[in-house]
Amino acid sequence: MKKVTMFVWNHFTNDARVNRECTALSERYDVNLIAIDDPKDDSIKSFEEINENFKVTRVKRYPMIISCYQHDKTKFLITVGSVTTVIAATFLYYNWILMIYLASVLLMSAALIKVRSLRKRFVNLAIIVRMIKAGYSQNSDIYHSNDLNTLPQGIVCSKLRLKPRKLIYDSHEVQSSRTGYNPKKIKRIEKFLINFVDDMMVENHTRAAHNEEIYGFYPKTLYNYSELYDIEKKPVINLHQQLNLSADEKILLYQGGLQEGRGLELLIEAMDYIDEGTLVFIGGGKLERTLKNLAEESPQRDRIKFIPKVHFKMLPSYTREAYLGFQVLQNICYNHYSASSNKLFEYIMAHVPVVSCNFPEVAQVVNGEQIGLVVDSHNVHQIAKAANTLVKDENLQRKFSENCRQAKLKYNWEIEKTKLYDTYSQLEQKKSKHIELTFSRFTKDGETHA
């Protein structure tokens, strides 16, 4: 059985897409996923065996010196200061040049620890080095990098060898157009690094066309559909009881990261105009505190609830409790505009109608399958109007819910994963590429030249 090493820049515990890919590949390959440890969560293990052919290795997040500093800053500084004083005095006695050298090293080290931006770069570099060390030693036949932040690791492990290995770049986002990133800088980096990959996958055809426009080739597509399952067979969780809601209260659900550009502030504002139901957020993220403050200030505060992040294996049990689901991404970058949104397919799989944005990939599914209402996601009143339509018209809600039962047979991972198998099978038949700076191996449909 051939070996696959995959990299992902997270803890993996809530990454449903990577879990689906690794699990599917483990049916044909020996899969090793290299992720990042979380020192704040004791339940996350440094090594985990998901199944016989799928194992997870998590590298340490922080170098030892950073860990000691974070554990007890005062004790760390006193200890380091005392040791440094003794060493400096010794060096001064023998050689003042050595003392100056030591002082310079200490100043640079202090800057790495105390200056947040430098500390972050130092930590990230240490993670990259650990990932490379772990991945290189596995000596796999195929390396698979999820997103741009693990592509350098994949390149080093696959190409810096006497006998180069094959490398797949699996880009889940539009790396050159995301919030919080320098688009010009990222574009230059990505354009350079993709010269070294043997094949590339993106989430959908909208993004593949965009990739062709900026980089000159059309990669393969692998949609982020949910696994096909019978929602009735999932464990039952009484979310109404958990939230102290009456059994007939309609849950208006948002599940996913509490991040910028997802229209979450507008959902809270829209509750002023939604006549019935309780808005429930499931997830965590950078906006969590802000959203809770907004909810507390809202006249509808009693109708807005928060639930912490739920493990992806348990999430369907929560999703099924919803009357409708929100997916109202904001058009703040091309990454959002072009998204297919895995949350949309999670709603579909649980037979939950949606109120969604009108972006191409999302609207095509919602309108085409008639599973919900499409709105201008920047317009609070349109969001509220659509929610009220579904809340008041239970027959329409049931119709959309029934349509979800049919749509799930079309948009599911059991069908989509065959494209992943095809990509790997085609890659196996080709010789590994040596480092070369050319796009000539890619054709219009994403296939590769022999």
Regions found by a protein language model. Give the residues of each.
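Membrane-proximal helix-turn-helix segments that form the acceptor-binding/catalytic region
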Residues: 21, 122-137, 152, 160, ...
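Donor nucleotide-sugar binding/catalytic pocket of nucleotide-sugar-dependent glycosyltransferases
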Residues: 35, 57, 176, 191-238, ...
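Nucleotide-activated donor-binding/catalytic signature segment of Leloir-type glycosyltransferases, i.e.
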Residues: 282, 289-319, 324
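Acidic donor-binding loop of glycosyltransferase active sites
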Residues: 303, 319-338, 352
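A short, well-ordered alpha-helix in the C-terminal region of glycosyltransferases
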Residues: 241, 382-385, 389, 396-410, ...
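Conserved donor-binding/catalytic core segment of Leloir-type glycosyltransferases
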Residues: 245-272, 280, 401, 420
